[in-house]
Amino acid sequence: MLHYLLSVLLLIFENILELCMCITLVILIYYFWPSKQLEDATLQYFPDTTQNSSEVFIDPPERNPIFYPISPLRHKKRSSKEEMTPDKKRDSSEKISKQPPRELFEPNEQEQVPSHIKPEIFFVLKALEGLELPTTWQLDPKDVETLSIDTGSVVLSPGRANDVIVVVISGELGIFTNVSLGDKRYDCNIKTLRSGESYFSQTSIIEILMNEKPNNKYIHLKALTSCRVATYHLTSFHTSFIANPQQWIRTIQVVMTRLQQCTLITCNMYLGIGGKCLNAKRKLPDSGKFKDFNKLTEAEQLNKGVEAIAQAMGIPDQSDKLREKVRKYECQAGTVVTEENSFEIDMIFVVFGKLRLKRGDLEHDDTGTSLTFDVYPGDMLPSMQILTNEPAMCSAKALEKTIYFKICRDEYIQFLFAHPVIYLRLAFHALQFISPFARVFDMAVHWHRIETGQALFRQGDKSDSMHIVMGGRLRAVDSTKIIEEYGRLDLIGITDMAEKRPRRNTVMAVRFSHIVCIPENLLSFVKIRYPQVGNKLLKLISKCWKAPTPETMSHVETTRNQNLRTIAIVPASRRVPLTEFTCELYNQLSKHVKTLRLSSSVVENYFESEVITKKADYGLMHWLNVQEIAYSLVLYQCDFHKTNWTRRCLRMADAILMVALGTESKEEQVLAEALLSCNEKGVRQSKELVFLWPIDTPTPSGTAAWIKESYYSGYHHLRAPNRLFSFPLKTREKKIVEYYETTVYGEISYQSDFSRLARILTGNAIGIVFGGGGARGAAHAGALRALIEKKVQIDMVGGTSIGALFGSLYATTPDIRAVGRMKDFFTDRLRNNILDVVRDLTWPYCGILTGHRFNLCVQRMLNDVNIEDCWVSFFCITTDLTSSSMRIHRNGIMWPVVRSSMSIAGYVPPICDPQDGHLLLDGAYVNNLPADIMRSLGANVVIAIDVGMSDDNTNLRNYGFSISGTWCLFKRWWPFGEELRVLNMNEVQNRLAYVCCVNQMEIVKNAQYCYYVKLPIESFGIFDFSKFDQAAQIGYDITKQKMEEFFEDSVATRRKLLGCARNVRQTPQKSKNDNILSFVNMPVLPKPPSDIKSD
């Protein structure tokens, strides 16, 4: 009875107390609400949008910091006709930043057959286009024959000469070969040809030029449907070669390069059957004439060796000239004669003993076939390397005492120039090393040469092949979104092919690219012959497979600076110190990757001047492609004029850096746009802005003016050292390079802005994300201080809620001063007296506070700085209530989005986004620790600082279906009895903030790229702003301890966090020779001069 009476009294007391609180609140609002001032401020910054929709948002003046809308009740309500439509919201957003151009996402239209050319002629010319045939050769339309083929009819059968091109005009044609299954043999379709596609054996061209009959032993063509085909016989090639042999050198080189890239590299690197490409049953050279060679005198050895070399090179009448160039060498067993990946392309002719060729450390491929190959007396090497002008695929080691003759590179180039038949003989000799299986594979594989903007395939196309990028860069797009970009040796489309579904995305060429296309039917044939290939393909699929993009990340804009091989550097004005900038950047890049700097003056040292000025030169093009193989990153420095070199730089670039002076306006720097227009193919690469500022610049400014006019995928602000601006504008490039070589190169400051840019470009960027947690975020200050003391580099920063504020403070002042600014924010919050708090109270329609004092506090810390004007790249997370999604903010005025990221529901109202009018709330509700977003924006490693509270579910009271707050308050004050453990409103809010991102947090904790730091500060409340020092000390101690653990984990981890990680990319060795000669526009790779030599 007593218990019942006490409950009734408490209920009455609770109702009376609530009534009194409401009356007090109404009185305080009536007397202290600054209605006139707030109404004026609201009208000043949020004018009536019904009069002028273009004035939805006006930047606040510097000396009158007000706030965003206090409450929707304070504004004129729009009628249904005045509601902002999605189109109007989008228009408003576009005024803040330029939207990506359609060229980034839409490929060119498919090439159509011209009306003035017959389809059969057009398709034959397209099939021959990639061979780069000499201009002296012309196609005679009379030699093209058109045939109508019934279903099942055979067009080409084994035993016939393989000297014909077959092009499908309509219908389908199958390429078949025999395969054994048990005791039976079956016809296996290794490729299906459709309209516009062709069949011909490119290796047969070498035999045709040698006037040999290329026999077809393994292939037959059969019509899968009724079709029309065009045939053209290649016999005219030999006639043209006899008349102009020098002009066919480039075609021979293209054929052999295609063989190496399409067949040899593919089978070895991706299918694991490199040993099957070697012809173990090849006809060995006649070694009898070299019997007892070591017993001959020196003069006899030289005479006999020179005669044999001249005979092998096809110039027996030039023995006397060769004798002056040839040098004899002897080596013992175990001596390495040539190195793998070397550009030492001196020609070697073995006359005694035996050499063994070997690739890598493996003795056998996945099928158990030996990867070694023996070279006997009478063999020349490295013939394939000489032909393709690419690094050696194998090393050569002596198995016994060996005698060989060598002709240095410069000498035999002279012979090649004078006697082009040598080049053809080398190619014919190299084909003797290729197995019949490799030849069949080479006939079915296709080598695409795709111009900028062309589509490799389109969304919805049939997935019947996989592709390998051998050169260039491609981009996968989906409507208006970049999915992925692909560089050299990347795989494309293998997952779609494995899942047998239509292409999910469109893949287009960002620049001129070389692609190897492997049909699904060919892979099935290979798996039948060598089942071990299936395991290799599964590994490739597992590496390429990616989980579907979460909805919360579907709109993340990324710069995709992954696997960059070439970068074009374009000046925004003639006053930009371009050479100095390129040298500074080169110096920092060289500590991460093997880098080459090329400018027009550098290339002129190796080529005739007319080569640089020509619009198209295949020799220079090939030479530049070889540099991409030899170096991990090539910097192309453009000219200050619209020259062919500038055009070539833009065409060869994976990405473009536009360098501008931060102290000058955009109107004064319009040169870059003019230079970009000289690329008639259009600019489809990612284009990023780089602003150069004096070293003592406090804060950048003016970036918004650039991004309003043109789209840039990123922007970087660099505080340049004084030496960058010390040279007069007309100083010769050679003088500047000499200064950097003698004074600067090797001097690395990992804390500099140039070093930060180098890490971003090489994929070594370090990002840090600060999590939300209210006043517990004070621990972020201690964590940041520990990171700075440990010299951990921070290249990108992001955060949620209180972490967004701390991240923004570091982004604008990237040094220890940011810690002091964090403390100032907490001190500012403590200055609010009771009267200020009461004045900020309002009727709890959107929140119990107007947000006015909160706005002033945040804006006082950040002023009117734009996000794009930060020294360090910054983003923050908010919850978009209008679209029920996560928002990632990377541009616009900083303080409103930071404030919205800290807006706890129920306490302060959401902020109306000035760009589109969406309601934004605390980002902790969707992603409290956005390490995954930081990773998607290009960070290689992410340091995640978590100050969220851990769930403590122990001793929670099971109070049933209802509970009285007054009873809980009474129990808290009552000193007798057991403690009542019930979640209060703050605790409920905290837990709600983590409900939606629990799974994401677990993924982040276990991610290999993430270095997770959990700060144990659960004892602090989210409004304990008076305990800054205590929380900061805990953050400092724990973070320092965790960093020491990470450093001790491995040397690689330490180097990553300190910003000095070096990319592990296997790159060929440089040549040791200094001189270079060119022959028929095909120079070999020279040693880079001192001004471009990498450390």
UniProtKB/Swiss-Prot annotation:
The active site is at S801, D922. SUPFAM superfamilies: cAMP-binding domain-like, FabD/lysophospholipase-like. Residues 80-105 have a biased composition (Basic and acidic residues). It is found in: Membrane. Belongs to the NTE family. Residues 75-113 are annotated as: Disordered. A nucleoside 3',5'-cyclic phosphate 2 binds at residues 327-416. InterPro entries: Acyl_Trfase/lysoPLipase, cNMP-bd_dom, cNMP-bd_dom_sf, LysoPLipase_patatin_CS, NTE, NTE1_P-loop_dom, PNPLA_dom, RmlC-like_jellyroll. A nucleoside 3',5'-cyclic phosphate 1 binds at residues 144-237. A nucleoside 3',5'-cyclic phosphate 3 binds at residues 450-509. This is Putative patatin-like phospholipase domain-containing protein M110.7. A motif (GXGXXG) lies at residues 772-777. Its EC number is 3.1.1.-. It comes from Caenorhabditis elegans. A motif (DGA/G) lies at residues 922-924. It is a single-pass membrane protein. Keywords: Hydrolase, Lipid degradation, Lipid metabolism, Membrane, Repeat, Transmembrane, Transmembrane helix.
